Amino acid sequence: IPVEVLAQGAWVLTDPAFVEAVGPESQVEAAVSAVGLDLGDEVVLFPLGPEGPLEGVELRPNRVRVVERREALFLKEVPLSLNPPPGRRLLDYAPKTVRLVGPREALEGLAGVTATLQEALGPGEVEVAVAPDLPPGSIPWDRFGCGLR
């Protein structure tokens, strides 16, 4: 079963990443993960099922070693404001939102992002790539351009 180590603000990689559940068949079949709390370089694991902790299930091994901690990233969808090039008027654009991924500090107070079109575009509908002004450490989750009218 997969190992899940709970750590505040971090994604934890362990060795091993999977452990074996041993015990009564009905309990072992209910095991969905081996869970532990990141308190140091070694983590004690507990078997967990859909209803909570599982009695009578032994994990082999019952401890894992933390091999890496990575900063946790978060996903947030925010409004996208698009400014036309100087001297031009923008009638409409899509998409109106953008999904960003980044550290919590970069995204939690973010109310929206703005992009300014640099190209001088002729009249009509066009597809263009845009580069919004993003907070440090964040990137767009989806590849996107804007359709303009």
UniProtKB/Swiss-Prot annotation:
Residues 1-68 form the YbbR-like domain. This is YbbR-like domain-containing protein in def 5'region. The lineage of its organism: Bacteria, Thermotogati, Deinococcota, Deinococci, Thermales.
